[in-house]
Every structure is written in C-alpha cells, then in structure tokens.
Amino acid sequence: MSMYNELLWIFTQLPDDYIVLDTETTGLPDENGLPDIVTLGITVVRNRGIAETIEFKTQPQKRISDEAQSIHGITNEQAAAFESFDSQWQRIAGYLKDQLIVIHNASFDWPILLDHVERYGMEMPLIQGVFCSQKAAIPWAQAMNHPCGHRGPSLNTLTEVLGVEDLRAKGDGRHGAEIDSRLTALVVETLVRCEFR
C-alpha cells in the first residue's frame, strides 16, 4: 500500500452513514445567474454500503443549453413534463435532514441547490455538513500524478484510477444525477478503504 494513502485520511473520518447528492442542470452559471436543476440524484449510504438510490426529475424554468443536453441527454421537451422542484422538495429534504451530504464538486451543486430552496421559498433542513469528495482527493491525486484540475480530480478520473465499475458505460455513457451519485458513493467508499490497484 502506497504511503500516499495517508493523504486519504480525511476519507477514513467519514461516518458510516451519509447521503451522496448530484445534480444535472440546464447549463453552467452565467450572467443570468445559476442554472436550474433538471435532475437531482441521491444515494443513501448506510453501514458503508449503498442502501438506496433515487432520482428526482424537476421541471426547469430556464432552457437547457445544447451543451448540457449533450452531457445528460435530457431535452427541453422532456423536462417540460417533469414535476416542479417545490412539489418534490419535502421528499428531497427528508433525505437530507440530519445527514452529512457528500458531493463531488460541491462548489457547483450546493449553491445551485441552495438557490432553488430560496427561490421557491422552501426551508433547508438541518444537516451535519457538506463534504466535497473532489476537493478532498486533491492531495492524493496530485501525489500520485493523476489528472487533477484546479477543482480536483474528476469523477471519471477517480473511477478509472481506482478501478471502480464505470456505471456510465453500462448505459449510454452520459452523465445522470442518479448514476453519478451512486458512482460517487462507490468511489468514496473505495477511498475510505484504500482498496484499489
């Protein structure tokens, strides 16, 4: 086992139970503000294993950009039939309440979620905190010379270098909030155990 695995200590401090959250959106932040959520995926981790995965499809108020459509494959026509964010918030909040929320690239997903909660006049439940798996993996990824941008190693990079099953490849290769939340949970648990090639 590499001595660089000591750089993964922060992952070993994660509780046995937590929630992984991921979103797919209408695009990137721009001069008009933050993008809208199109899908929100939650993976429930209990006793270091995946207990449940669920996806909420939410009707955006903004149009989905061509680039975003190419990433997640959801068209504006499809999204128009989704339920509103506020009509699903109580169910989403029920998963988040009193939990540690793990997000890969939390600096993207978390502000967007908070923006939606405020915009729709909802209330965020009390949570334990937010853990960004991308930022936490930076020291290890850099020491191991793995590709690592300024935000940290991508989920694709960690999936590949850790030998985690690529759930995206099982489908059409596109991103999806449910798939990516589950994939993040598998990557995080692999880093917790330091079990990889």
Predicted regions and their residues:
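Metal-dependent phosphoesterase core characteristic of DEDDh/y 3'-5' exonuclease domains
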Residues: 5-17, 32-40, 44-74, 93-197
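Residue-level marker for buried hydrophobic side chains located in beta-strands
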Residues: 19-21
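Short acidic, Gly/Ser-rich segments with clustered Asp/Glu that frequently serve as metal-coordination loops
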Residues: 23-31
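Metal-dependent phosphoesterase signature
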Residues: 70-90
